[in-house]
């Protein structure tokens, strides 16, 4: 087994062109230790499958978002990859169905298989959902205790959390009351909780309605008055992703809205520096208290020279025993229904991490049907990008909120026309 960190030059050039007929390239990004764990379990796979060599190319997440689609369009992509644009890359996917037990896959992965499909009528098997995620807040409980402020309880609203986090920050001199990752996916749950529908009556994607506008107004206002850590959104251009995990880890941030994939990182890097916990997504004026589901999956690409070998690798990772091991070692929520029903004994997880994963799993019941539909919508990547770019322009003052919303509408119309 070989695990490699790709340089910028290698990313631009692509990772295709295997040196031998037995070599497969697996483009992988990690939220925590996922690529390291895959490298380890695939070493065992190689021992059982002489002549197959799976090289794990570790890349930044931004490379998955930006470089991989370019490589695939040029025909220079890897054999398989860990992706998050599940439906958006469907045109490049290898259909695993001819090579795997479809009954096992359908019973094990259920509805998540639809997130990778082209749409109604497509029954192909394209991706193994490797980690189920849900967005939600991490809270610095130590800062609340030091401030003598009671933490809002179940069913608390975004306004109540903003007021409490601000009070805590002022009492403790913490740098930032709140932050939300710079991501269209991350703000979708809050927007839905404010009443955003995200689809029109015909089921086509739409961004701007009264609910979305209400959230946009409030989010921009919070960035202007210091409730939100402004530089998370204002410090980047275009639709570039930016999280605020380090600010939270450093103890500078009271309330951090991100997601379950961060649990392993928090467990490892916060340690006993302070007490942290996960709470349910706050509620909005529309009565919803929704996060966004999502996650990552491992897919093969039709341009590979070795489709049967690629399918064999992914099928191995999808086996219940291997999937359960990877889930336990990476501290992720399982999308495999058999693994989920059996329960996961998370490896070396602290009490805080175990409680956090339990809290995230429990909050899945509060996820709006709109959020599940949005996650599976093939046009969501364009909508995420438009959201980030135009909201950021409103935050930095390049546009008013009204102008930003107008641009979102025209941007989405153009994107949908281009995709036809």
Residue spans of the language-model regions?
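Extracytoplasmic "Venus flytrap"
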Residues: 24-40, 59, 133, 375-379
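Mature extracytoplasmic/periplasmic domains
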Residues: 261-264, 300-381
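Hinge/lid segment of periplasmic solute-binding proteins
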Residues: 84-134
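C-terminal capping/gating helix-and-loop segments adjacent to ligand/active sites or protein-protein/ligand interfaces
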Residues: 355-413
């Amino acid at each position: 087994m070989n695990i490699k960190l790709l340089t910028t030059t290698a990313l631009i050039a692509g990772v295709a062109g295997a040196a031998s007929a037995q070599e497969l390239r697996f483009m992988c990004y990690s939220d925590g230790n996922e690529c390291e764990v895959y490298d380890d379990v695939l070493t065992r796979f190689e021992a059982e499958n002489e002549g197959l060599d799976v090289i794990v190319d570790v890349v930044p997440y931004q490379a998955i978002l930006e470089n991989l689609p370019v490589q695939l369009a040029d025909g220079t992509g890897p054999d398989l990859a860990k992706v998050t644009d599940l439906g958006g890359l469907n045109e490049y996917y290898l259909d695993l169905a001819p090579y795997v037990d479809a009954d096992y896959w359908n019973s094990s992965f259920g509805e998540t298989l639809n997130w990778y499909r082209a749409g109604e009528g497509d029954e192909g098997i394209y991706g193994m959902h490797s980690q189920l995620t849900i967005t939600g807040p991490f809270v610095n409980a130590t800062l609340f205790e030091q401030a003598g402020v009671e933490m809002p309880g179940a069913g608390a609203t975004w306004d109540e959390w903003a007021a409490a986090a601000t009070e805590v920050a002022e009492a403790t001199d913490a740098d930032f009351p709140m932050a939300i990752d710079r991501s269209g996916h991350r703000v979708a749950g809050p927007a839905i909780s404010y009443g955003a529908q995200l689809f029109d009556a015909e089921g086509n994607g739409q961004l701007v309605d009264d609910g979305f506008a209400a959230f946009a107004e409030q989010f921009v206002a919070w960035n202007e008055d210091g409730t939100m850590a402004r530089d998370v959104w204002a410090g980047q251009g275009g639709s570039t992703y930016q999280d605020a995990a380090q600010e939270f880890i450093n103890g500078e941030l009271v309330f951090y809205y991100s997601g379950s994939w961060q649990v392993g990182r928090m467990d490892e890097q916060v340690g006993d520096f302070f007490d942290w916990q996960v709470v349910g997504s706050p509620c909005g004026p529309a009565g919803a208290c929704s996060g966004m589901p999502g996650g990552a999956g491992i897919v093969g690409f039709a341009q590979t020279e070795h489709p049967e070998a690629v399918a064999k690798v992914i099928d191995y990772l999808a086996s219940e025993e291997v999937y359960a091991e990877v889930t336990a070692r990476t501290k992720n929520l399982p999308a495999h229904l058999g693994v989920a029903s059996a329960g996961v004994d998370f490896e070396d997880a602290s009490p805080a991490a175990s409680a956090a994963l339990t809290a995230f799993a429990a909050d899945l019941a509060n996820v709006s049907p709109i959020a599940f539909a949005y996650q599976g919508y093939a046009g969501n990547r364009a909508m995420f990008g438009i959201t980030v770019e135009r909201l950021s322009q409103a935050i930095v003052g390049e546009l008013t909120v009204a102008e930003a919303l107008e641009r979102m509408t025209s941007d989405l119309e153009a994107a949908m026309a281009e995709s036809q």
